[in-house]
Curated annotation (Swiss-Prot):
Gene3D superfamilies: Ribonuclease Inhibitor. It is found in: Cell projection, Cilium, Flagellum. It comes from the Eukaryota. One of its GO terms (cellular component) is motile cilium. Pfam families: LRR_9 (PF14580). Residues 269-290 have a biased composition (Polar residues). This is Leucine-rich repeat-containing protein 46. InterPro entries: Cilia_flagella_integrity (IPR050576), Leu-rich_rpt (IPR001611), LRR_dom_sf (IPR032675). PANTHER family: LEUCINE-RICH REPEAT-CONTAINING PROTEIN 46, PROTEIN PHOSPHATASE 1 REGULATORY SUBUNIT SDS22-RELATED.
Length: 323
């Protein structure tokens, strides 16, 4: 269909010169919204609102078609096949530009970017560096991996040409790191978070982070040791618990005896063997009653017979006494 062909043409506009930046490509990488019929008008207003555009790793060979990106402050074009720096004058608000890993041979067409603070041109093919082509507003510049960095006096010349530069090729310019500069840089980084990228972070960030983590670990170890020592010094507290009431053993019919407060408890058996022997010697109460009844009956009978046979009993008694 004609519409599909046109869309494919806009998405990957390939000519003999290479791959160009298109609005369709920008939309594909940086915008997401539902499909509808009136897409062109919506795209127009949305592109105007973009502040960060990522087009890295798309095989782009030429920079162009950025006129609608009026408000962007960060542009990522690394890992492409770009050979020239061009067509950037239309985005004067740009603060962050990454062109690392391309095929650029010359630094040019950057003077219109008066607010540019971060420029990454590492891993390109720049042999001769034209310092007058670099914006004076630069704070961070990375040219690592270019032949021009091997030139005698290269670092001194770049620092002298850029009075605001604070970091060159991942190395801070120590003589320019004053408190005023740090306060100014922190304010700008809060406004533009892209300035907190890997090259900014290497200005002592990881060293400070490692030191802070080490101090935190030492504090935790000290706290654990203090807690351990305090626990070792603490003596256990013994409390007097009330005695539980005695539980009768199996086969014992005697009621449980509760001790009155203030009286000492009677000594108890110290072994199960003694308890067993004592239980065997005890006579039930009902058996004692029957024995006493029989003794009473015998006593009554004896009294009656004694009246009838008194002489004989006396005689027998005398005989026992003589014996």
């Amino acid at each position: 269909m004609p519409g599909d062909k046109q869309e494919a043409k806009n998405a990957t506009q390939k000519t003999e010169e290479g791959v160009h930046i298109t609005e369709a490509l920008i939309t594909k990488r940086n915008l997401t919204f539902p499909e509808d019929e009136d897409l062109s008008e919506k795209m127009f207003h949305t592109l105007d609102d973009l502040e960060t555009v990522r087009l890295d790793g798309e095989g782009i060979t030429c920079i162009g078609n950025l006129e609608r990106l009026r408000n962007i402050h960060s542009l990522y074009l690394q890992s492409n096949k770009i050979q020239r720096i061009e067509n950037l004058a239309c985005i004067t608000s740009l603060r962050f530009l990454s062109l690392a890993g391309n095929q650029i041979r010359h630094v040019e067409n950057l003077l219109d970017l008066q607010y540019l603070q971060f420029l990454d041109l590492s891993e390109n093919l720049i042999e001769t560096l034209k310092l007058d082509e670099l914006p004076q507003s630069l704070l961070i510049l990375n040219l690592c991996g270019n032949p021009c960095t091997n030139q005698d006096g290269y670092r001194k010349m770049v620092i002298g040409a850029l009075p605001l530069l604070l970091d060159l090729d991942k190395q801070p310019i120590l003589e320019r790191w004053t408190s005023d500069e740090e306060d100014k840089s922190s304010d700008e980084e809060e406004e533009f978070p892209e300035l907190n990228g890997p090259f900014c972070a290497e200005r002592g960030f990881f060293k400070d982070l490692e030191q802070e983590l080490h101090q935190h670990q030492e504090r935790r170890q000290q706290a654990a040791l203090t807690e351990h020592l305090s626990r070792m010094e603490t003596q256990p507290v013994l409390t007097d618990l009330p005695l539980l009431p005695a539980v009768p053993m199996a086969g014992d019919c005697s009621p449980a005896v509760t001790e009155e407060p203030g009286k000492e408890a009677a000594p108890k058996a110290t072994s199960s063997t003694q308890m067993a022997s004592s239980s065997k010697k005890q006579v039930p109460r009902n058996q004692k009653g029957s024995v006493q009844a029989r003794k009473g009956a015998l006593a009554a009978t004896a009294s009656k017979t004694s009246l009838a046979a008194a002489p004989s009993m006396t005689k027998s008694t005398n005989k026992r006494g003589t014996k």
